[in-house]
Amino acid sequence: MEIKEISVPQQGVVADYMNGKKEIQSCFDYMLTEDAFKQRVQDLREREFFRQDLVAHLLEYNTKLQAGEATIQNVKALEDEDTYVVIAGQQAGLLTGPLYTIHKIISVLQLAKEKEESLGVKVVPVFWIAGEDHDMDEINHTFVTKNKKIKKTIFHDRNPKKASASESELSLEDCRKWIEEIFKTYPETNFTKDVLRFIDDSLRKSNTYVDFFGHLIMKMFMNSGLILVDSHHPELRKLEVPFFKQIVSKYKEVQEGLHNQQEVIKELGYKPIIETKSNAVHIFMEIDNERVLLEDNQRKFVGKDGTYSFSYEELIEEMERSPERFSNNVVTRPLMQEYVFPTLAFIGGPGELAYWSELQQVFHAIGFRMPPVVPRITITYIERDIATDLHDLQLQESDPFLNNVDKLRENWLSNQIEEPIDERFEEAKKEIIDIHKSLQQFVKKIDPGLSSFAGKNEFKINEQIELLERMLKRNVEKKHEVELNKFRRIQFAIRPLGAPQERVWNVCYYLNQFGLDFVDRVMEKPFSWDGKHHVIKL
């Protein structure tokens, strides 16, 4: 593996944040400097956390996932008042979801290690699985290449239920068939059988989406010390009850903080991402297997436009009786994370960084300071055959990141022809239409009854010219079919569906190609935190 960095243009909040623009950095409580991290440690030392109860739960949960010894030791280390966490989170995508989930975890592991060394305190890596999510459409699929096209392959459970990812039971038989279908689209390699066994071992131990995700991630990062937490685990929810109560008692301050911070964002020229009603309580309650967002309505807490209604006392009583029925929304999830964990740093993707810029005054409303927010490491893998294609087409490795691949293809094709086809045909059509318009005027003078036919005649002539243009382009493309296929392969590999590779492809493809130690070898590479994109040649 060979790694290099390239500068990829970014936009909006992320670009300005990474470029050190003071206006947007003022929307965060800490700069990404060593002094700021030292200050964060001091600030965390002044707060109290329910460490013993948290450790007891994390030990039980991670042991069930058959965590390695390094993970168990890291969990136990959290009992110490001077141990902190670097944390990130993601939904429980089947087969771990897109590559960026793996890259988030790599980011967490690397930053935790670096900060432990530089700050001289114990820092452990934590990955927060968003188990409360009910949107199965976001986690029940993966993308594959089939018949020279990118296909979205959806897992259809035979017994779908409206439930969270932590509670949605997987049909193991159906899931096994789905996995087999995915692997049929991969080339068979010396690693295929081992990877399938690796996956099936995790599947057999799982009952839910979160189980399957947790077992796979734990096996993949077995010796890394990574701690996993299911945000919707009933035992964790019990520990969170005091903070749920606090949110309910301060929801107006939370909403006001969000509104005020979004006004700041607007004044700086950015468009806010978070959309909420002015009466939102920012807590979900599970009612009849449905996740219902609570709202304030005349001193009552209501859901589904008043279908469900609770007094403050009733809501608090229900939280104490059934804490597993409650979960956070996009606004309060970061607050709950801050309440539960002594967070040295939060690692997020571009979208998360943008919406966290809207939360500063929300944190302050609860009496917290927002932790340092660190953009995750971004990675693209270039296989040997794709590197060869780039070389054959005289393209730089950075070209597909800085330019639209379709545009690169068009430019290359136009350079193979003496005169641009589009321009020549446009000129011809204009000249022919001008002549035909004059001819139509002549026809109209002599026989007005033929005016309509003359117009149709113009349309047919234009159709024939366009047909000739299409046939010429088709023949030119056929002549250069070998080279154009290289562009298609580059597009599929590096910018599938016009998106970054890490947002589409799944890690299982790379495990199948390069072995079960693929992720371990990636983690050995040096990554920087300067916002540059990392390209790894395989």
Swiss-Prot record:
Family assignment from sequence similarity: Belongs to the BshC family.
Functional note: Involved in bacillithiol (BSH) biosynthesis. May catalyze the last step of the pathway, the addition of cysteine to glucosamine malate (GlcN-Mal) to generate BSH.
A GO MF term: ligase activity
E.C. code: 6.-.-.-
Enzyme class, spelled out: ligase
Key word DNA-binding present: no
This protein's encoding gene: bshC
Keywords: Coiled coil, Ligase
Positions in coiled-coil regions: 460-484
Domain of life of the source: Bacteria
Protein name: Putative cysteine ligase BshC
